[in-house]
Each structure stands twice: as structure tokens, then as C-alpha cells.
């Protein structure tokens, strides 16, 4: 049986799904890509206006309709509540950080006053405004080539993208600055993929489970649980970053932040706990953010 791997049709999405296809073939499972068009691929409105699941619901619908056997998502795009219809596998995470692609090799600090920077993510907008209130932040949608092309053409001075995406399509050298999470905190589960199949497909589950990376799973789950407990969606100005440390890599450090869209206020809290219990640590961090006033910032 040849597995039908559903993916969005962008260069980045097909590259990501292609890597998963090749890994499955390495484990002896034949697979091919099936392109599924999502509302987010055809509607260039701000993502928060299109609705929840803008990049993922069409793939899940295709799974339910038996049009595909496996769906490959960017984990950060999935709704935060687990869906009992699907089995989830999370492979090894790429670099979670954000990157700046600027003209003339400039860093954020070196951009001239009033420079035009493109991004549509509220999380990035709020943090950029806190770091550089003088910048003109402009909305930006489209694939990686389209976004970076606005810098090449001079329409924008810089854009901010996920470094993982740049790396996956071989464009990591275009980054003029890669932000430390302490400077620009990434989105929950940024850089991680989510692979889903139907829960009743036991043979497919056995094959997909070979791709599971436990450390990526627990750190991404911790970050996304913060988002869930804050009752915020993937487009909210919320960031989170988890790492595993300790002698056996069994201690998790989880930092999360909630930001005012105008950059005027930010709430950040960090805590450590057992890596094997990511939800408990996330609930602790979310509770502290709520106590500090996160609900007010989230509107």
C-alpha cells in the first residue's frame, strides 16, 4: 500500500512533507504526496480574520474523507485542543527561532529609524514594537519567496520569518540575524511538524510512530498547553519556548509571554519542572501569566 501524504502546495509545505515521505521510505513504507488546497493558501487576508484551522482543517477533512492517509502540518497551526479522531506523531524539531532578512545585511538594531518591516503575526509585531517603537510594521502574507522578494525589490527594508522555514528550503544563509528567544520569543511549537492519521489505521500508526521524537513532543506540548490554558489561538500575541536540560535531559525550562499589540506591555514568566509532565509545568506558567493580567492583554 502506498501511503497518500496530504500537504499544502507551497514550496515549504511540500519540502517538509517530502522529508517525511523520504523518512518513511527509509523505514520501508512507500509513500507519495497529495496536494490539498487550504483557505489560507487562496485567501491573503490576515489569518486571524479567516478563522481557526485556516491551514489545517482542509487536511483533516481529507483524512476523514479517506482522500489521504497521512496529513503533515506545521504544529503551531493546529488548534490547541487534541482531536480524538486522529493519531499524532511529532518528528524531530527544527530551529525554533525567528530570523530577520534585511537589506544590506542589516540587523534589527542597525535598521534605520522608521524602517519598513513586514510581518503579520501579532506575536512578532508586539515584540518588534517593544524593541524598536520607531519601526513601521506592515502586513505580510504569501510564501517565503514572495515575502523575501519584497526586501529584494525595496518595498520593505526587512521581513521576519521562522528560521526553520528558511532552513528547510535551503535559504538559511539569507538570514541577516537569528533572534535569541530571550530577545524575540517564538510561537508555541514553532519549528515542529505534526503528522496525523486516522486513529483506526493501526498499520499506518505503527509506521508513523518510527518518526516520533520524544523530546520534541514534550517541549511542543508544553508550549501549546500554555496557549490552550490562556484560551488563546495560534494568532494571539502569545509566545512560548521550552528546553530540556539536566543530567539526563529530564528537566524542562518553560518560558512564555503575553504581549500588548502596541508593544507597551509584556508579561513573561519562566519555570522549571519534570520533562515527563509538560502539561503540569505549562499549567503553572499559564496560571502565573493569568495572575499577572494576561486576560486583559488578550482582550
From Swiss-Prot:
Pathway: Porphyrin-containing compound metabolism; protoporphyrin-IX biosynthesis; coproporphyrinogen-III from 5-aminolevulinate: step 2/4. It catalyses: 4 porphobilinogen + H2O = hydroxymethylbilane + 4 NH4(+). Keywords: Porphyrin biosynthesis, Transferase. The keyword Disulfide bond does not apply. Its EC number is 2.5.1.61. Its cofactor is dipyrromethane. GO terms for molecular function: hydroxymethylbilane synthase activity. Binds 1 dipyrromethane group covalently. GO terms for biological process: protoporphyrinogen IX biosynthetic process. InterPro entries: HemC, Porphobilin_deaminase_cofac_BS, Porphobilin_deaminase_N, Porphobilinogen_deaminase_C, Porphobilinogen_deaminase_C_sf. The modification S-(dipyrrolylmethanemethyl)cysteine is found at residue 234. GO terms for cellular component: cytoplasm. It is an enzyme of class 2 (transferase). PANTHER family: PORPHOBILINOGEN DEAMINASE. Monomer. Belongs to the HMBS family. NCBIfam families: hemC (TIGR00212). Tetrapolymerization of the monopyrrole PBG into the hydroxymethylbilane pre-uroporphyrinogen in several discrete steps. HAMAP family: Porphobil_deam. This is Porphobilinogen deaminase. It comes from Corynebacterium efficiens (strain DSM 44549 / YS-314 / AJ 12310 / JCM 11189 / NBRC 100395).
Amino acid at each position: 500500500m502506498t501511503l497518500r501524504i496530504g500537504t499544502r502546495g507551497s514550496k515549504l509545505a511540500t519540502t517538509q512533507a517530502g522529508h517525511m515521505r523520504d523518512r518513511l521510505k527509509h523505514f520501508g513504507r512507500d509513500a507519495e504526496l497529495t496536494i490539498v488546497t487550504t483557505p489560507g493558501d487562496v485567501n491573503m487576508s490576515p489569518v486571524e480574520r479567516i478563522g481557526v484551522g485556516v491551514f489545517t482543517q482542509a487536511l483533516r477533512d481529507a483524512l476523514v474523507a479517506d482522500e489521504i492517509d497521512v496529513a503533515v502540518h506545521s504544529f503551531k497551526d493546529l488548534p490547541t485542543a487534541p482531536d480524538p479522531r486522529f493519531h499524532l506523531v511529532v518528528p524531530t524539531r527544527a530551529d525554533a527561532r525567528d530570523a530577520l532578512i534585511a537589506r544590506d545585511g542589516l540587523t534589527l538594531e542597525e535598521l534605520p529609524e522608521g524602517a519598513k518591516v513586514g510581518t503579520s503575526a501579532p506575536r512578532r509585531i508586539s515584540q518588534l514594537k517593544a524593541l524598536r517603537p520607531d519601526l513601521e510594521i506592515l502586513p505580510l502574507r504569501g510564501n517565503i519567496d514572495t515575502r523575501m522578494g519584497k526586501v529584494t525589490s525595496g518595498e520593505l527594508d526587512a521581513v521576519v520569518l521562522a528560521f526553520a522555514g528558511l532552513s528547510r528550503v535551503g535559504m538559511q544563509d539569507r538570514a541577516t540575524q537569528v533572534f535569541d528567544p530571550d530577545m524575540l520569543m517564538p510561537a508555541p511549537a514553532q519549528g515542529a511538524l505534526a503528522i496525523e492519521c486516522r486513529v483506526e489505521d493501526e498499520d499506518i500508526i505503527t509506521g508513523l510512530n518510527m518518526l516520533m521524537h520524544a523530546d520534541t513532543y514534550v517541549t511542543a506540548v508544553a508550549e501549546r498547553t500554555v496557549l490552550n490554558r490562556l484560551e488563546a489561538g495560534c494568532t494571539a500575541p502569545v509566545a512560548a519556548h521550552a528546553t530540556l536540560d539536566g543530567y539526563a535531559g529530564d528537566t524542562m525550562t518553560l518560558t512564555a509571554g503575553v504581549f500588548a499589540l502596541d508593544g507597551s506591555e509584556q508579561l513573561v514568566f519562566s519555570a522549571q519542572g519534570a520533562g515527563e509532565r509538560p502539561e503540569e509545568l505549562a499549567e503553572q506558567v499559564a496560571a502565573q501569566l493569568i495572575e499577572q493580567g494576561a486576560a486583559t492583554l488578550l482582550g
